Amino acid sequence: MLTTASSADILTLSPARGLRGQVSIPGDKSISHRALMLGSLAEGETVIHGLSLGEDPRSTAACFRALGADIPELNSECVRIQGVGLDRLQEPAEVLDAGNSGTTLRLMLGILAGQAGRFFAVTGDRSLRSRPMGRVVEPLRQMGANIWGRAGGNLAPLAVQGGSLKGIHYHSPVASAQVKSCLLLAGLLAEGTTQVTEPALSRDHSERMLRAFGAEISVDVAAKTVAVVGGSRLVGQTVQVPGDISSAAFWLVAASIVPESELLLQDVGLNPTRTGVLQVLQEMGADIQVEKRREVAGEPLGDLRVRSARLRGCSIAGDLIPTLIDEIPVLAVAAAFAEGTTVIRDAAELRVKESDRLAAIAQELSRMGAQVTEYPDGLEIKGGIPLQGAEVDSHADHRIAMSLMVAALAAQGSTTLRGADCARISYPDFIPTLQRLINPSSAS
C-alpha cells in the first residue's frame, strides 16, 4: 500500500506481496534530450514519437524554444519540431535555465560555444549549480570557446560568447557520454575534425543519432575514439524513442526481490552501451528473459519479462560501470537482498550526480538495516540481512527516491520516504504505476 501525505512529497510504503502486470516504459531520457536538440539544429521538420515527459527533457525543450526552435507542448505520441539550422540559433533575451538537467546544460554548452557573434547566459537549479562543469568547459576552451563562470567556469551560472572553434583530439579522463556528446556537438560547428577518446566506451546515442541526421561521424571501437567532421548539414528526421532501460531497472529489481512477482516491461531500449544492468542482474541470478527483439530507428529494443528470484552477490567494476552508471543505486538495493557480498568499484562519477549517490544510497540503506561500507569509488554491501522499514530521504535525487521505493517493497514494516516527488524528474508516472502493480492482497 502507498500513502501520500498532504504535502505530496512524503510517501509511506508497506511491503508488497507481489507485483504483476505489464508496464509501458517511458521514453529514454538520454535519447529524448538528443532528439530535441538535433531536431532544433536540423533543417526542416523532425518528428519524435515516444518522447520522455520527465522534467529534464522539458528543460531542454524550453531552452531550445528560447533559442528559436519551434517546439510545441511535449507529448509522448508525436512532437513535430521545426529546426533553425546548425549555426542559426537566436540570442535570447533571458537566461537559459536547464533546471535539474546536467545533460541539458553540458550538451547545450557545446552547441552555444560555436554560435558566432551571439552571447548566452546559462544556469540551473540549486543542485545543478553545484555540479562540475569544468569537465566540458576546459576542452571547449581548448577548441577556442569563450566561457566564463563561477570557480573559473567550473560552476554555473555560466556566460558563453559564441565564436569560431577548431577541432581537437581530446582524451577524456572519464568515460562520460555528456562530455563526449558536448564535444561532438561543438565539433559540428568547428573547423576540421574533432576527436574524443575515452578510457571506456560510454553510451553511444549521440553517435547513432548524429549519423542519422547527416553528420559525418566515425567510431573506432578498438581505440575507444569517436570523430566528427565540422561543417555537416543536419536534416530533420523521424525519431522513435525506445523505453528507458534506466527506468526499467527499477521494475527489474522490484520484481526480482518481491516474492510472487511477474512483470512484462514493453519496448525497452537494449542499446549495448546501456545493458550492463541486465548483465549484472542475470549474473546475480535474476530471472529475466528478453522477448521480441527488434530494431527501430537504429536503436535495438525488446520486451523484458522478469520474475521473482533468489539473488546472489557479485562484483561490479571496470568497463562495465559506464554501461550501468545510472542503475547503481537500484543495483545496491538488489545487493542488499542478495545472498553474499556485492562489491562496486570504479564508480566515483556517482559522487557528482544530482546527489552524491554513493553516500546517499549507503546512508539510506543503512537506515533500513543494510550493512554497507562506502569507498571513495564504490560500495561493499553484505546482503541477506532482512531490511526494516524506516524513515528515509531521497536527497532530492530521482534515482535515489525510486531506489528506496523499491527497497521498501521488500522490507519488513512500513517505510516513510521524504522527497518522493522528485521521481517526476525522469519518471512522472512511477508512483501511479507502482500503485497499479501492487498485488491487491498486499493492501491493508
Swiss-Prot record:
Looking up SUPFAM superfamilies in the UniProt record yields: EPT/RTPC-like
User: Which Enzyme Commission numbers does its entry carry?
Assistant: 2.5.1.19
Q: In which pathway does it act?
A: Metabolic intermediate biosynthesis; chorismate biosynthesis; chorismate from D-erythrose 4-phosphate and phosphoenolpyruvate: step 6/7
- GO terms, biological process: amino acid biosynthetic process; aromatic amino acid family biosynthetic process; chorismate biosynthetic process
Reactions that this protein is recorded to catalyse: 3-phosphoshikimate + phosphoenolpyruvate = 5-O-(1-carboxyvinyl)-3-phosphoshikimate + phosphate
Compartments, as annotated in UniProt:
Cytoplasm
Transmembrane spans: none
Entry keyword set: Amino-acid biosynthesis, Aromatic amino acid biosynthesis, Cytoplasm, Transferase
Amino-acid positions noted as binding phosphoenolpyruvate in the UniProt annotation, renumbered to this chain: K29, G102, R131, Q178, R357, R399
CDD domains according to UniProt? EPSP_synthase
Active site (UniProt): D326
Which InterPro entries does this UniProt record tie to the protein?
Enolpyruvate_Tfrase_dom, Enolpyruvate_Tfrase_sf, EPSP_synthase, EPSP_synthase_CS, RNA3'P_cycl/enolpyr_Trfase_a/b
Which residues are noted in the entry as 3-phosphoshikimate-binding? Answer: K29, S30, R34, S176, Q178, D326, K353
So which domain of life are we looking at? Bacteria
Keyword Cytoplasm attached = yes
Q: Which GO terms describe its cellular component?
A: cytoplasm
Which top EC class is named for this enzyme in its record?
transferase
* GO MF annotation terms: 3-phosphoshikimate 1-carboxyvinyltransferase activity
Keyword Zinc on entry: no
Q: What is its main location?
A: cytoplasm
Task: Briefly state the protein's biological role.
Answer: Catalyzes the transfer of the enolpyruvyl moiety of phosphoenolpyruvate (PEP) to the 5-hydroxyl of shikimate-3-phosphate (S3P) to produce enolpyruvyl shikimate-3-phosphate and inorganic phosphate.
HAMAP family the UniProt entry points to: EPSP_synth
Q: Which PANTHER family match?
A: AROM/DEHYDROQUINATE SYNTHASE (PTHR21090), PENTAFUNCTIONAL AROM POLYPEPTIDE (PTHR21090:SF5)
Q: How does it assemble?
A: Monomer.
Report what the protein is called. Answer: 3-phosphoshikimate 1-carboxyvinyltransferase
What organism does the UniProt record list as the source?
A: Synechococcus sp. (strain JA-3-3Ab)
Q: What lineage is on file?
A: Bacteria, Bacillati, Cyanobacteriota, Cyanophyceae, Synechococcales
